[in-house]
Amino acid sequence: MEAFAIAKFQRHGSRKVGLVLDQIRGKNVKKAEEMLPFIEKRTAELVYKTVHSAAANLEVKSGKKLDLSKVYIKEAYANIGPMSNLRRIQPGPQGRAMPYKKSMCHLTVVVSDEKGGR
């Protein structure tokens, strides 16, 4: 059985979230939740909350309490979110405008109680 959690419109870059996701992909949920507080990235807290939510969704879906050491992270990925509303302009030299963009991402975590997957 599978369950998933999606965190949309998060104010982190998808590449930076991907660095944390690479470290937990394929591991069991208990081990991932123990590892994440010690990863020194700002995005680790976001990933922790999403993994915890996906595991809770699986418990609700199955209708019974699950052992988190037997629940595995099947898929974990971050997609690029919209950038249209987070464009800003900074004054540049000689009266020019220098635009910069603040990035967003959508984070998806899929957990399964069967070992294997991708």
Curated annotation (Swiss-Prot):
InterPro entries: Ribosomal_uL22, Ribosomal_uL22_bac/chlpt-type, Ribosomal_uL22_bac/org-type, Ribosomal_uL22_sf. GO terms for biological process: translation. Pfam families: Ribosomal_L22 (PF00237). One of its GO terms (cellular component) is cytosolic large ribosomal subunit. The keyword rRNA-binding applies. Keywords: Ribonucleoprotein, Ribosomal protein, RNA-binding, rRNA-binding. GO terms for molecular function: rRNA binding; structural constituent of ribosome. Part of the 50S ribosomal subunit. Belongs to the universal ribosomal protein uL22 family. This protein binds specifically to 23S rRNA; its binding is stimulated by other ribosomal proteins, e.g. L4, L17, and L20. It is important during the early stages of 50S assembly. It makes multiple contacts with different domains of the 23S rRNA in the assembled 50S subunit and ribosome. This is Large ribosomal subunit protein uL22.
